[in-house]
């Protein structure tokens, strides 16, 4: 009910699985997900990222994986990713979902 022109959901740092199904409607322009950076960064699990992507596709909402974070769990292994590579590694995953509106 607020007069907000552009509604985006930023799930960062992503520290656990999220059910966004109650929030994903035509008013949401995009959901963006990223892990936590820094020396004491907590783990972001790639399965959580993929689950949010699945929810976005089901609701036909654009999805962006913008940053891996410093510690990314994928396939049972935790990867330490230096800050300068966190954005490019997220892009290389190739999981962004765009639609024409």
Task: Describe the predicted segments one by one.
Residues 1-3, 24-25:
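Short, surface-exposed basic-aromatic patches at helix termini and helix-loop junctions that form
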Residues 2-11:
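Short beta-strand/loop segments at the ligand-binding rim of alpha/beta enzyme cores
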Residues 15, 19-101:
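Auxiliary Fe-S-binding modules of radical SAM enzymes
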């Amino acid at each position: 009910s607020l007069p907000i022109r552009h509604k985006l959901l930023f799930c960062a740092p992503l520290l656990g699985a999220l059910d966004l199904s109650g929030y994903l409607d035509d008013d949401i322009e995009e959901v963006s997900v990223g892990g936590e950076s820094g020396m004491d960064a907590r783990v972001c699990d790639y399965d959580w990222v993929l689950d949010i992507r699945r929810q976005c596709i089901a609701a036909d909402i654009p999805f962006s994986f913008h940053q891996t974070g410093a510690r990314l769990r994928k396939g049972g292994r935790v990867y330490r990713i230096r800050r300068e590579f966190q954005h490019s590694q997220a892009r290389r995953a190739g999981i962004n979902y765009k639609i024409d509106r």
